[in-house]
Amino acid sequence: ILGYKAPKLISYSYVLLDGDKMSTSAGTVVLVTDFMKAVKNTLINEFNKRNSEISVDKLNILVNACIKFTMLNVSKNKIVNFNLENATSFVGESGMYILYSLVRINSILKNNNIELTEEIKFNNEIENKLVKELSLFPEVIDELLTSNEPAHLTKYIFGIAGLFSKFYEQVNISNEVDVVLKSSRIRLLKSTAKVLTNALS
């Protein structure tokens, strides 16, 4: 129609909420509005624990992100068991963990806005691992398009976020006196942010 290709439907298995099936006869049906409200309230509690504030608009975006990531992170041939606590956690294999990693990267870049050198060098193994993993992004996208398995992408970006977490623990950027090394690390974080942003788009 109108020159556009018809979208390809990818069917998924059942979705369980914390391991339970929904049943009208048993009165266990959960409305979408109630489900999203539960996710929102859980996120609010998470932010309150951290004494952090968030706007309503951003909160709604995070609600959708938590649900989407959790659903897509399961193979289409498997039952999706939606665990509210895991889906909204800032740690572990969740959308919030990925987004938190991206926020942290952008914060580092904002605080280290320097002129970058042409020369590139690294001196830490975790840097090389991150470079190698980032280079696989085009292959992951090709595999996703071939297999119609979004979980390939979610698993990949979770791995990227995990490598960044190790990078964050082992590597210092702000206090680095070697200009070339500092510049190289900033370039690496910019590339990491770009891959994560594109993958989440």
Regions found by a protein language model. Give the residues of each.
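Non-catalytic interaction-recognition regions
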Residues: 1-201
